[in-house]
Amino acid sequence: VSFFGVHNHSAEGSNLRLRDSINKVPEMIEYAHSLGHAGICFTEHESITSSLDALKYYDSHKDLEGWENFKVVLGNEIYLCTEDITAENKFNNRYPHFILVALNAHGHQGIRELSTKAWTKNSFMHVMMRVPTYYSDLEELMANYKGDIIGSSACLGGALPHRLLQFQDLERANPKEYEKIWQSCKDWIAYMNEIFGEGYFFLELQPSHMMEQIYVNHKLIQLSEETGTPYIITTDAHYLKKEDRQIHKIFLESQEGDRGG
């Protein structure tokens, strides 16, 4: 089975509110194809502005020899929040990442609708423009798009990975209390499976040398086994090749400010 890159960022789509990616849409598609991948998905930071560029480039290549089975898929990396976000509420004042991927044109319509709704609630908070999607917004949308959109738990900036890391030390210090945290993680997964439908929500693992990501990967596999929820492996790509890493680092450091969600 060929790899399909589900979680990727481009300069055209993810640099609207912050410095994030040095990838260019045409280069991403070409490189994924050259590696023999089955396809590539664009999941920008609450933005669908790269979709048109991606579709145009794909349409100009899909009939060429060797491109018959390659697919370009469109998604979005939203900020899935509780509705009590305020500047004073430091604990809940986070903007957890969450991945949406359209399985068809109808699904992409739903992603566009949700993105539009999020932008109507934008506000400037903590040095950058914030664009929240509330859980209630996602529930309302998925009532009409179940089976057309898949969701995933995203990167370390996601709600589930963040919770796993937040209470990591509690696992040894107070196993009884940690069991409650563990159950809350399983409850959150069950909630997502209910919203998206069984088999349409995924736990997201990412290859990394970072101890935090390695820990989260192990815990997500354990949660997958205990809940029967499938997992995917993504690269959360912000640059194409290993040798581009330093260039990407310099790009991020060229502007002060908080990149995080």
Spans of model-derived segments:
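Phosphodiester-processing cores and adjacent nucleic acid-binding clamps
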Residues: 1-261
